[in-house]
Amino acid sequence: MRKINDYYAKKAKKDNYPARSIYKLEEAQKKYDIISRGDSILDLGCFPGSWSIYASELAGPKGIVVGVDLQQAVGGGRADAAPIHWICEDIREPAMLEAVRRIRPSFRVLISDMAPKTTGNRWTDAQQSLNLCYQTLEIAEQVLLNKGNYICKVFQGGDFPDFVDAVKKRFESARVIKPQSSRIESREVFVLGLNYRKPQK
């Protein structure tokens, strides 16, 4: 287990990504084609930036990435990658959405590797994680384009099945995935929604 964790940490450093979490998104991307060239991507809870950087590479120079976090991320997209705009805001505050919309009003993909500060209480941690996930889903309903894609990290426990059902109701296809690069002992999984059913006005 430790060897696997060390492998991904070392690989991230070698590949010039801030954190090993990039390989969780990479694994999901290879299997489900979440992000395409030219896409607009909103990354909630983006710090330290691995997912945003990887998403910018997938989207290419005609795409755009907006990363939001309470902690200020730094750096930009790599050569031949989409520009990255960093926003230091709380996703629970209206000012965050206003700041995002000043850059771009809508997105084709919403991604989130966000996690709460853990307490050690499994039930409490799971519920706090779910609260954040529901917040990302609410934001998706406001900014995601029709047929857009969504992926969000969540800790299993508590009302987790209800959250999965909520995603299923909003997307044509939804599933729960556990990347190989996730720590074996971790309760984290990712809920994936493909092809958002945007309500018709």
Curated annotation (Swiss-Prot):
InterPro entries for this protein: RNA_methyltr_RlmE, RNA_MeTrfase_FtsJ_dom, rRNA-MeTfrase_E, SAM-dependent_MTases_sf
Annotated S-S bridges: none
GO MF annotation terms: rRNA (uridine-2'-O-)-methyltransferase activity
Pfam families attached to this UniProt entry: FtsJ (PF01728)
Keywords: Cytoplasm, Methyltransferase, rRNA processing, S-adenosyl-L-methionine, Transferase
Record-level GO cellular component terms: cytoplasm
Active-site residue list: 153 (proton acceptor)
Compartments in which it is found: Cytoplasm
Residues reported to bind S-adenosyl-L-methionine: 49, 51, 69, 90, 113
Catalysis performed (reactions): uridine(2552) in 23S rRNA + S-adenosyl-L-methionine = 2'-O-methyluridine(2552) in 23S rRNA + S-adenosyl-L-homocysteine + H(+)
EC number: 2.1.1.166
Function recorded in the entry: Specifically methylates the uridine in position 2552 of 23S rRNA at the 2'-O position of the ribose in the fully assembled 50S ribosomal subunit.
Family: Belongs to the class I-like SAM-binding methyltransferase superfamily. RNA methyltransferase RlmE family.
PANTHER family associated with the record: RIBOSOMAL RNA METHYLTRANSFERASE, RRNA METHYLTRANSFERASE 2, MITOCHONDRIAL
Protein name as it appears in the record: Ribosomal RNA large subunit methyltransferase E
Source organism of the structure: Desulfotalea psychrophila (strain LSv54 / DSM 12343)
